[in-house]
């Protein structure tokens, strides 16, 4: 019997901070690399391209020993592109930079390990330096170089989309390569919707794609006197909420019942967020949460108490700390404080707030890619990175097939169950089919499943690149040894009404996949 789980098989941690220092000559060179001639592998090529000892390395098929080492050490390379879901269009000569600015994070220890391997192999300290460029996927704008100077993250603060670009949606593209010339690949963000400007009219759910649903991620930023240089973002660092001018946080916004009490555990509601409702903001990275808040519409320097329309993208809003004496979430320089509003003498449905208590809200998204050089550096880019969305188990007993559904699949991919490579058939870019290995592949001498055995599911490319998933496969205990072929033939010739289910050992019950969010 079998069971499928969606479980994280490791904790994400920010390891492998890269030290990158570049001369003007190197900056000029990497710019040539990005603006060079596209090659058939999705990268770029120029005549001045440096040569690496790994450049012409033939593909190395992943071995069981290499997979075993990977499962023990998990030297992954994770790349995260964090960005807003909408972008405001620029008109004429103005440049409305994407806000909050797209962020690139390089996580896990594999980046540091790869850097050391390339530096030692090519005997050059610049060989392991990571170069990254970002663009909006348009030939009208050059890609901008990102500054990974001694950090594992960087931001693109000067990206914009002009009115000459007629696209209604676009994706950011990040191109990366090492100083040795080895390409990491080209990575896309999630889709971003282009809007002209925030709507000042009362919103309705007819424009649901601009509304904000409970449970989705948002960013909050404050811009004093509409000055770009004064922009600060709500962020969590060192266990504290603060207003950062460098990094921004992504927060899950949950809708609560009005009578929900303050607690570390709370019940959330579905639906779109409306002004006047009780919400909870939870940091998507640390899990830290603010107290219960009532979200209120902002008009100039006042919070409207009786507004009840849906919250929309790039609206200005205020967050009243529920059950407090007119206290609002506010910033003061880098600190997050409580600001006490004052009633409007002529308008009882409004309270006066200061600029620091007015926040702009926008939905966010992220694209995350994880991979590992299981057999050492390869000459090909790791992209496109396959992504698994779901698994479907078919059959059972002696023959069980697993359908893998996702995107960016290719005939060069194999499904691995732990240390065991499965017979894999390529269907299309969205589907793979594989044979579930026998339990004896994992437990020597076993002819049936005596106790639960859980193994991770990973995808592996023909040149040893490992693409981990957060999925596991569980072999669940069977009632006894599987029947011999002679026994199966006897059963198949027996009248149906004489077969007792408990007399057919080893066939078990097929347990359909159960999915749990993590």
Swiss-Prot record:
GO molecular function terms noted in the UniProt entry: DNA-binding transcription activator activity, RNA polymerase II-specific; RNA polymerase II cis-regulatory region sequence-specific DNA binding
Compositionally biased tracts (Polar residues): 36-50
GO cellular-component term (any): nucleus
IPT/TIG domain sequence ranges: 386-476
Keywords, ordered alphabetically: Activator, Developmental protein, DNA-binding, Notch signaling pathway, Nucleus, Repeat, Repressor, Transcription, Transcription regulation
Ranges of compositional bias, category Basic and acidic residues: 24-34
UniProt-listed Pfam families: BTD, LAG1-DNAbind, TIG_SUH
Keyword Nucleotide-binding: no
Disulfide linkage: none
Residue ranges for the DNA-binding region feature of this UniProt entry: 89-96, 223-232, 296-328
Listed Gene3D superfamilies: 2.80.10.50, Immunoglobulins (2.60.40.10), LAG1, DNA binding domain (2.60.40.1450)
InterPro entries (UniProt xref): Beta-trefoil_DNA-bd_dom, BTD_sf, CLS_fam, Ig-like_fold, Ig_E-set, p53-like_TF_DNA-bd_sf, RBP-J/Cbf11/Cbf12_DNA-bd, RBP-J/Cbf11_DNA-bd_sf
GO terms classed as biological process: Notch signaling pathway
Record region (Disordered): 22-59
Cellular compartment(s): Nucleus
Keyword Transcription: yes
Listed PANTHER family: RECOMBINING BINDING PROTEIN SUPPRESSOR OF HAIRLESS (PTHR10665)
Function (record text): Transcriptional regulator that plays a central role in Notch signaling, a signaling pathway involved in cell-cell communication that regulates a broad spectrum of cell-fate determinations. Acts as a transcriptional repressor when it is not associated with Notch proteins. When associated with some Notch protein, it acts as a transcriptional activator that activates transcription of Notch target genes.
Quaternary structure and partners: Interacts with activated Notch proteins.
Family, as annotated: Belongs to the Su(H) family.
Protein name: Suppressor of hairless homolog
Organism name: Halocynthia roretzi
Gene giving rise to this polypeptide: RBP-JK
């Amino acid at each position: 019997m079998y069971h499928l789980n969606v479980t994280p098989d490791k904790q994400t941690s920010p390891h492998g901070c890269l030290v990158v220092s570049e001369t003007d000559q190197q900056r000029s060179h990497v710019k040539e690399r990005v603006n060079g001639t596209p090659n058939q592998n999705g990268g770029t090529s120029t005549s001045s391209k440096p040569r690496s000892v790994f450049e012409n390395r033939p593909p190395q098929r992943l071995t069981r020993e290499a997979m075993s080492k990977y499962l023990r050490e998990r030297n992954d390379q994770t790349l995260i592109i964090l960005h807003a879901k909408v972008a405001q269009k620029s008109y004429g000569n103005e440049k409305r930079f994407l806000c909050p600015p797209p962020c690139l994070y390089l996580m896990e220890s594999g980046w540091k390990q790869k850097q050391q391997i390339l530096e030692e192999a090519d005997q050059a300290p610049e060989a392991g330096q990571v170069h990254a460029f970002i663009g909006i996927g348009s030939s009208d704008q050059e890609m901008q170089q990102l500054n990974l100077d001694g950090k594992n993250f960087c931001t693109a603060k000067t990206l914009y989309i002009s009115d000459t670009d007629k696209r209604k949606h676009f994706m950011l593209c990040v191109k990366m390569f090492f100083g040795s010339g080895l390409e990491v690949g080209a990575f896309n963000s999630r889709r971003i919707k282009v809007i002209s400007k925030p709507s000042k009219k009362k919103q309705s759910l007819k424009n649901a794609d601009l509304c904000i649903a409970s449970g989705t991620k948002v960013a909050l930023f404050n811009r004093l006197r509409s000055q770009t240089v004064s922009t600060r973002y709500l962020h969590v660092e060192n266990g504290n909420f603060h207003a950062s001018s460098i990094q921004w946080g992504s927060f899950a916004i949950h809708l609560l019942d009005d009578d929900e009490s303050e607690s570390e555990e709370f019940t959330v509601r579905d639906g779109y967020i409306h002004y006047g409702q009780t919400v909870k903001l939870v940091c998507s990275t640390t899990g830290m949460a603010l107290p219960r808040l009532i979200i209120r519409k902002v008009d100039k320097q006042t919070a409207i108490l009786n507004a009840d329309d849906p919250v929309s993208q790039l609206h200005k809003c205020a967050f009243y700390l529920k059950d407090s004496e007119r206290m609002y979430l506010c910033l003061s320089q880098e600190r997050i404080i409580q600001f006490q509003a004052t009633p409007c003498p002529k308008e009882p449905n409004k309270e006066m707030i200061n600029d620091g208590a007015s926040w702009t809200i926008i939905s966010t998204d992220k694209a995350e890619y994880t991979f590992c050089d299981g057999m050492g550096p390869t000459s090909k880019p790791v992209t496109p990175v396959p992504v698994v969305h779901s698994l479907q188990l078919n059959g059972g007993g002696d023959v069980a097939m697993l359908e893998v559904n996702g995107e960016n699949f290719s005939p060069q991919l194999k499904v691995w169950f732990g240390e065991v490579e499965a017979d894999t058939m390529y269907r299309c870019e969205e589907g793979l089919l594989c044979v579930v290995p026998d339990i004896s592949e994992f437990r020597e001498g076993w002819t049936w499943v005596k106790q639960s055995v859980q193994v991770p599911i990973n995808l592996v490319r023909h040149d040893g690149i490992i693409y981990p998933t957060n999925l596991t496969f569980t072999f669940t205990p069977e009632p006894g040894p599987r029947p011999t072929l002679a026994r199966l033939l006897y059963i198949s010739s027996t009248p149906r009404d004489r077969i007792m289910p408990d007399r057919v050992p080893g066939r078990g019950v097929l347990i359909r996949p159960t999915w749990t969010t993590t």
